[in-house]
Amino acid sequence: LADMKKRRIWLWQGDPLGSAFFDASGLSPVPLPITEVYTSLSTGLIDTTIAPPLGAIALQWFTQTPYMTDIPIMDGIGGLIVSRRFFDTLPPDLQALLRRTGEAAGKRLISETRRDNAKSLAVLKQHGVTFTTEWKDKESDIFGLRDRAAAVLAREDYIPADIYDQARKALEAYRARKTGK
């Protein structure tokens, strides 16, 4: 983290999740719209970005950042959300269809994203990007920051506190089952 405090890190302007993470870490990011990142890397206004491998390639940011780490801090989250009131008006066969196709599409998206990430990492390596792994010695610190940022978002009611608590309990139960504790 001390090394990161020396960096000029891009934060997607208006991103409350990123802001909470940086607040929890004590880092001071440079908020910019995504359209200004490449130019800002080129001019030195920023020297560090957070992006998935495919994004770093598509936006050509990797040409300005010769080092990359694989810290798992960025998740893509999405979904088709409909109100319970609307969903309940659908006939049972359409409800089942929506659930079945949604689950299949979600699994396919995860599989394709993982495949694209693996391909993108190979492309980045071919272009001379150096991958660092020092963070793995401090993995618990990184995840502790994530947890503190989530708690801040719950306190600020960005994430409803009751939903945050339910999610934390479900995660703890999952981890306990997975480790057998």
Listing of model-derived features with the role each one plays in the protein:
Residues 1-181:
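N-terminal secretory/targeting leader peptides
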